[in-house]
């Protein structure tokens, strides 16, 4: 039996690099050789035991790779050696939710959020992709892994916060938390034409990045009363749309208080424990406010559209990948990411350490990055 290297969840606060069986595709499935993946905040929740997955599962849900093997029925759609990504959400395209356009809630046997949740994920040398016809998106020529590695989850999720909030041209928008998802939500607000974009975070370095990604005002809650400032800037009303991108009671409550009557709070955070909406924050339920939640849209067409924005220079996500590690060094990488050290935003993982070494060697020689259009 062929084996591969993978990071296996063993139980709360315990992951290990192990040799496990390499997957074999059935009809309609594909096996990818993973070239790049990342660590996500949801992975931290899983390892800490805050989100239930079974011990023995390979986690990770942001795959970039090369097609290693195709199951029957895919020969005319893809080819071995083709560079592709798959979304963190893998819709089947046939169930009630898929047919009604809510792909993230797919109820297909292997649809919805499955990678690193109910089926083996991307922290491995190889990944089995179900319903490959609906989920594998070819990477456009000229794009590197680092250009697109955030498309499967972070970019799609952040952008969906702006989409679900139904931001209109000229709206005022406040984005609470400027981590990778919040920064992509800030970018989404800019792309949708918001006139006032307020980035909120307690980390000044992240606020500086928020300005680059579209915020024209930034607020640090350690220095100002954020809700009062947002209301002051919006003639006392509050923002038309607020986006909560952290998943904590405090940020959810502040976002709610900063949302004007008739406005929308778009919630992107993954919450654990009880979430409370104080009655005065929702004007005793009389303010015509909307609270919407969303899980990152996936599927082949969503991935194609996200990569199109990158390939045309409309979007540059490379600055969000701040650290790189070999998959073998997952413990060091996970500790840095989970403890938010060294200005980390996103950590890229490389199952093939030689590829990472070659990248570092190129950087040491002063290899020039491709020129990008300004945001």
Model-derived features: where do they sit?
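Short Gly/Pro-enriched turn/cap motifs at secondary-structure boundaries
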Residues: 10, 21-22, 54-60, 115-120, ...
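Glycine-rich cofactor phosphate-binding loops and adjacent beta1-alpha1 units
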Residues: 165-169, 192, 208-290, 351, ...
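Glycine-rich beta-strand-centered segment in the early N-terminal region that forms part
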Residues: 21-37, 50-99, 140-142
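NAD(P)H dinucleotide-binding glycine-rich loop of Rossmann-like/cofactor-binding domains
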Residues: 94-176
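Mid-domain Rossmann-like dinucleotide-binding core that forms the NAD(H)/NADP(H) cofactor-binding site
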Residues: 81, 138-224, 228
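Residues in the short beta-alpha loop(s) of Rossmann-like NAD(P)-binding domains
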Residues: 203, 271, 297
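C-terminal hydrophobic helical "lid"/dimerization subdomain
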Residues: 1-4, 253-257, 299-375
């Amino acid at each position: 039996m062929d084996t591969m290297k993978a990071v296996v969840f063993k139980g709360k606060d315990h992951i290990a690099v192990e040799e496990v069986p390499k997957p074999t595709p059935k009809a309609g499935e594909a096996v990818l050789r993973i070239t790049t993946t990342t660590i996500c905040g949801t992975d931290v929740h899983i390892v800490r035991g805050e989100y239930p997955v079974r011990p023995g599962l390979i986690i990770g849900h942001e795959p970039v790779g090369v097609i290693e093997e195709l199951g029957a029925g895919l020969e005319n759609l893809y080819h071995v050696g083709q560079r592709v990504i798959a979304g963190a959400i893998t819709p089947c395209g046939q169930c009630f939710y898929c047919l009604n356009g809510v792909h993230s809630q797919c109820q297909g046997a292997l649809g919805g959020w499955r990678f690193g949740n109910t089926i083996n994920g991307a922290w491995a040398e190889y990944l089995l992709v179900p319903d490959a016809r609906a989920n594998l998106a070819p990477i456009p020529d000229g794009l590197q892994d680092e250009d697109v590695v955030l498309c499967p989850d972070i970019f799609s999720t952040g952008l969906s916060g702006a989409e679900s909030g139904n931001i209109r041209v000229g709206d005022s928008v406040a984005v609470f938390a400027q981590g990778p998802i919040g920064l992509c939500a800030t970018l989404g607000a800019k792309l949708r034409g918001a006139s006032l974009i307020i980035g909120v975070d307690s980390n000044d370095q992240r606020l500086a990045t928020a300005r680059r990604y579209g915020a024209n005002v930034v607020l640090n809650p350690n220095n100002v009363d954020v809700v009062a400032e947002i209301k002051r800037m919006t003639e006392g009303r509050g923002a038309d749309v607020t986006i909560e991108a952290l998943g904590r009671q405090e940020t959810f409550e502040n976002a709610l208080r900063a949302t004007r009557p008739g406005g929308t709070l778009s919630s992107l955070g993954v919450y654990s424990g009880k979430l409370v909406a104080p009655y005065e924050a929702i004007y005793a339920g009389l303010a015509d406010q909307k609270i919407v939640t969303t899980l990152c849209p996936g599927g082949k067409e969503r991935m194609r559209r996200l990569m199109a924005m990158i390939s045309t220079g409309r979007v540059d996500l490379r600055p969000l990948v701040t650290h790189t590690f070999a998959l073998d060094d997952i413990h060091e990488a996970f500790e840095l990411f989970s403890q938010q050290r060294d200005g980390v935003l996103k950590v890229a993982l490389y199952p093939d350490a030689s590829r990472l070494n070659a990248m570092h060697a190129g950087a040491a020689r002063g290899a020039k990055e491709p020129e990008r259009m300004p945001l």
